[in-house]
Amino acid sequence: YFIDGYHGGIYGHYPVGQTAFIAQKLRQNPNWNINIEIEPESWEVVRQRDPEGYEAFKRLFKDQSVESGRIEYVNPTYAQSYFFGTSGESAIRQFEYGMRLIQKHFPEAVFTTYSAEEPCFTSCLPYILKSFGFSYASTKNPNTMWGGYVSAYGGELVNWVGPDGTRLTTVPRYACEDLQPGSCWQSISWFNTKDYIHKCLDTGIQHPVGMCIQDAAWSHGWDKGPWLGQDTAAYYTPTAYKTWRNYIQDCSVGTTQDDWHFSQEDVLGGLMWGTQVMQRLAGEVRVAENAIVRAEKMAAYARLYKGMEWLTERIDEGWRTLLLSQHHDCWIVPYNQLQGKKTWAETVTDWTGVTNQNSR
């Protein structure tokens, strides 16, 4: 089995025509199913600049059933945050604001499995995910390990146990899932090679799965559609492309007694956290996190005891810019230009500045 799909958005990478491209490839490949993590703000931009592609994608997305649905939204967070460098409240708001915006464009969206192409993981996720209605997760990120990855543990399924004891059925980065030889940014599950599948089978994994959530960048080399390609000699056959929920519910062993007591030490960050720019970004984000939460508390007191107006738009915009400042690209490519203008690091200063201003 293989997990394919697309990762990106208007802040990271989402060229004009990307939505129409995905819809076209789905029509051309009826046995191809995908998993997506697209920044939620992208959809309003797509609706305006590519209405035909937008509507074609919406028609394909509408079927959210486990058996016949072809698209699963696996990371609905507002800005695909790494989580392990921010607060628990920020993690909650990433999901709350992201899911709310996605459902404006896709009211039938069902959020079943959490998965990410980047190392967007933290120890408290089982509780947060379950509170938002998720049933499953995966801790694989085999093709984008520059920012880090989680510990290798277990077999086909594990119960990811958070610090509060919450359990979530999860496809882990298998104990046998080593880094790709000669690479520090890929694991061997990035492509369903015969060696990878046989290694899994030999360790008792009955239904092994590989994964690559491709960059949403069809005009920049990511334009082949199904990741494994047409040359079946290059990978293990038969291989079926699945949504995560279809794989876990209908193809995997389904349940497990293997409890993985996941701690923050299982998040193996690969960023240069000691650099000055990282320290500055982390400080700016933390100041803004504290400011917006403090402002919400005071606004609640003012509402309850003084009957003052609840400033919904001001608070929401403060959270929006804070969530964007936690985008993984702010941390992994801080000196790259964002949309050809300021760098990501400079934009974090702007975004957190709005949050701080709105918190006063």
Question: Where are the regions that the model predicts?
Answer:
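Catalytic-domain carbohydrate-binding cleft regions of carbohydrate-active enzymes
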Residues: 1-360
